[in-house]
Swiss-Prot record, chains A, B:
Protein name in UniProt: Proline--tRNA ligase
Keyword Transmembrane listed: no
Function noted in UniProt: Catalyzes the attachment of proline to tRNA(Pro) in a two-step reaction: proline is first activated by ATP to form Pro-AMP and then transferred to the acceptor end of tRNA(Pro).
Taxonomic lineage of the native organism: Archaea, Thermoproteota, Thermoprotei, Sulfolobales, Sulfolobaceae
EC number: 6.1.1.15
Domain notes: Consists of three domains: the N-terminal catalytic domain, the anticodon-binding domain and the C-terminal extension.
Any Pfam family: tRNA-synt_2b
Compartments, as annotated in UniProt: Cytoplasm
Length: 481, 481
């Protein structure tokens, strides 16, 4: 079968809406509040599997899950002044309880630094308790005035994993930043999402952070999308909330903090990145159903029933071996209609089982990613499927990385950079002297957004694309979500 | 060791606050918004285990998990008039986004009937899709004006499992009510929470329901607490939202719905019900840590280290056998201090491992519930612990049921009933003619709350405690949370 990526790349926005709706992942645009969608059962399971992976990586590195209230009083949110400035125009406010006006406005959490630091101030007294790493997975709210998009730009972000850590020293917090980056790399690798890691420029840091490191991926339409951020908060929040701990030397001081987040966009990326014109291809690591069995009707009813029985038997065999399998037993749909449905749900492997397979005791296997097919004996099916699931997982990751890398170009000519970005072809790296002035000028001239610069040292034997001084590194620019 | 239940029964409220704080389950009263608490890591794990049990029972009976937006527009919430009347004074309203006044006020969901029915109206068209059973586990909000209590009466209920089902006929919905009741019985049995099941009287139904069935348990102070409700909604919401489906006979009609909920109170009950003056006793089915190992220091450092090594080895053996175990390796606390800590965390089994156990290759086991102790050889430890965990689980359930049953009294004398309730001794059943008038009079005269009447037929050869007509059933009354 021919694999095309026309709709997927040329009309990604329509493709994505179509997949979310027809694949029954997420109902968007019909709930009567702008920017808020509904996770349908199939999408919810995908989301749960992704959350499961995030939880495993965090739990196994000493992070402890907690759950804080949704609401933050206005006076508390205002304690860190840069922070509130960054969020002020995006906060939803609760002002009434029943018919009573509240004395203090309550914010729907846009993020939880101040809420969590408030309680850390009560819980943590000594360096002996550090490092401390909390996280929660919650809804956060942003009163977005830009155009909203399902899973990508929402007013209710329903899957915000936010980690918050506390350390004795600046360097300890920096080490935590590095650990967080390593954890995120593993999470995105497991999710088969390729990424570019950059330090965000000074003018685009998280409100209240000393440093912001960000993971961006490239979506099918060539736009970059931020999928994870890691912030070194220094003592900004501990000072604002007067949170001190006893240090090793006996003195009292403000601890250093970090925070890092991953959102619904992780789910959006998993659905989008490996897609084709048939729909998404879900990586086996998170696919809610790994194998779907489509029984192919025979010429007579009796044989059709035997095929169904054989199909169910095969499927049970997979489930017993922890390979989540479902047999589509609908008798009103044709096999072709079922192929369409399960392709748009992105199930990685399909089995087609008809009279031929029944008689020969075989199964006919089709991979969703490249539509290659295999026929194996029933007894060999478990091993073959396990092998194919591993292959699919690796192939998806490898191809997505190749695709991402092919979309990063270097240019020392600002006009050429602008032209590349105009073609929606991903990320352009331009040589940069390191000054904010030149950085902002680059954004202005390309009408694009600066993602930042590599965190590792980058040798650039070139001149800054703006001021023509010696370049210290490259600045990455892209059209973004 | 002597087991006392003085603090637990006489000053339950203080006992509960003490356990939540010292056991590090839930930080309450210190977050700067009334009625909103913080789930700390240990409490969060307990909550997750309880949610896991709820999910298993729902998933295995064809319920599908979804996630709806937190906010409900005012006009939508007003569509079912009885419903909004019931909740109107308890709703938190979002009225501003940034500095902009919103055109339509948005409610923080108090419950989700109207939100979910709105989308069901788009998703469900035919009887062939029915029955449909959705559920979500979310925060709901009530602007409580009564005194709030941790986990029991909150302004943010963070663990609201709400199921919503759709059926072709009234009878199908009634069957679903029965299924829901059976599921809840299994959930509460697994959680070792005893209950009384009643149909709530007409004047205390869920706002918008035709029938409300409720599970109440009795807390240590003798007050009844509602821990689960099941509602037959009839066509009230489908009519209000103009939600029709095609029936088997081809006609279009409003489907019948049910909804049922369990909240944070399930966690509160698990912590409260089996407690004693040392703290709670968590049932093994949900305890985050099933076995804690306390190494007992020896006279010299070398032997102490060997004890520690042996302790860790034992603990790893349990973990490998899926018995969650933790060794308390803190070298600054005495064994006695550790006993105190892990008792207040309710860990069902403690091992004390010292030089004697090291030399003899044994483990010393102590049950948290009755403080009985056992010494077994290391090789027998796994089996012994498994056996004890089962015994503890069964003993907790059995004793809690005995305790509950001993707190239900029958009285055909309203003055005596009032006196019993004044002593906080649980639930009183009084003979009742079935009229609302007499029911309300009973509430008034006893200064207590009517829980309702048994759902099964109850033979009562007695006269109504108010009107002296022949009693049709009993009415249950209690001081309640």
């Amino acid at each position: 079968m021919q694999i095309t990526r026309e709709k997927w790349s040329k009309n990604f926005s329509e493709w994505f809406d179509w997949v979310l709706r027809e694949g029954e992942f997420y109902d968007y645009g019909r709930y009567p509040i702008k920017g808020m969608g509904v996770w349908m059962p199939y999408g919810f399971k995908l989301r749960q599997n992704i959350i499961g992976i995030i939880r495993n990586f965090l739990d196994s590195t000493g992070h402890e899950e907690v759950l804080f209230p949704l609401l933050i009083p206005e006076d508390l949110l205002r304690r860190e002044s840069t922070h509130i400035k960054g969020f002020e125009e995006e906060v939803f406010w609760v002002t009434k309880g029943g018919s009573t006006d509240l004395d203090v406005k309550l914010a729907l959490r846009p993020t939880s630094e101040v809420a969590i630091t408030t309680m850390e101030n009560l819980w943590l007294k000594s360096y002996k308790q550090l490092p401390k790493k909390y996280y929660q997975i919650v809804s956060v709210f942003r009163y977005e005035t830009k155009a909203t998009r399902p899973m990508i730009r929402l007013r209710e972000i329903t899957t915000f994993k936010e980690a918050h850590t506390v350390h004795e020293t600046y360097d300890d917090a920096q080490k935590q930043v590095e650990e967080a980056i390593e954890i995120y790399k593993k999470i995105f690798d497991t999710l088969t999402i390729p990424y570019v890691l950059s330090e965000r420029p000074e003018w685009d840091r998280f409100a209240g952070a000393l440093h912001t490191y960000a993971f961006d991926t490239i979506m099918p339409d060539g736009r970059a999308m931020q999928i994870g951020t890691v912030h070194h908060l220094g003592q900004n929040f501990s000072k604002a909330l007067d949170f001190k701990i006893q240090k090793k030397d006996g003195s009292l001081d403000y601890p250093h903090q970090t925070s890092y987040g991953i959102s619904d966009r992780a789910v959006a990326s998993v659905i989008a990145i490996h897609g084709d014109d048939h729909g998404p291809v879900l990586p086996p690591s998170v696919a809610p159903i790994k194998v779907v069995v489509i029984p192919i009707p025979a010429k007579n009813e009796e044989e059709t029933q035997q095929v169904m029985k054989y199909s169910i038997e095969i499927c049970e065999m997979f489930n017993k071996n922890n390979i989540t399998c479902l047999t589509d037993q609908d008798t009103e749909k044709t096999p072709g209609e079922k192929f369409y449905i399960w392709e748009i749900k992105g199930v990685p492997i399909r089995l087609e089982i008809g009279p031929r397979e029944l008689i020969s005791g075989t199964v006919f296997i089709k991979r969703r990613d490249n539509f290659k097919s295999y026929t194996v004996r029933k007894e060999e099916a478990i091993n073959k499927i396990k092998e194919l699931l591993n292959e699919i997982q690796e192939d998806l990751r490898r191809k997505a990385w190749e695709d991402l890398k092919s979309r990063i170009e270097y240019s020392n000519d600002i006009e050429k950079a602008k032209k590349i970005l105009g073609n929606n072809s991903g990320i352009v790296e331009v040589p940069w002297c390191g000054s904010n002035e030149c950085g902002l000028k680059i954004e202005e001239l390309t009408n694009a957004r600066v993602l930042g610069y590599p965190i590792e040292k980058r040798e650039v034997n070139d001149k800054c694309v703006i001021c023509k001084m010696n370049a210290k590194t490259v600045l990455r620019i892209a059209k973004t979500y």
